[in-house]
């Protein structure tokens, strides 16, 4: 009976440690800045790991009033590039927590 209580207490401590580590990793990921680029850096965007855009840079030569569609495409390419990097890093960082848990 005493042994079972010790195992449960040990398991709870391990879960608390795991939860603390997950939060730390998530906080670090959220604070990381990811850049997305399009067409030789004609458009560069910056996002934090929690998907908040912090900056966008558009080179003057990418701005053509007669071709707004091109600029829109470049912005989309840069944003999608950044999102892809965030997703990849999130999977690498947080995936370790769900690999050995059934059902996740």
Swiss-Prot record:
Gene3D superfamilies: Nucleoid-associated protein YbaB-like domain. One of its GO terms (molecular function) is DNA binding. It holds the Pfam family YbaB_DNA_bd. Its main location: cytoplasm. Residues 1-19 have a biased composition (Low complexity). Residues 1-24 are annotated as: Disordered. Keywords: Cytoplasm, DNA-binding. GO terms for cellular component: bacterial nucleoid; cytosol. It is found in: Cytoplasm, Nucleoid. Belongs to the YbaB/EbfC family. Binds to DNA and alters its conformation. May be involved in regulation of gene expression, nucleoid organization and DNA protection. HAMAP family: DNA_YbaB_EbfC. Homodimer. This is Nucleoid-associated protein LSL_1227. It comes from Ligilactobacillus salivarius (strain UCC118) (Lactobacillus salivarius).
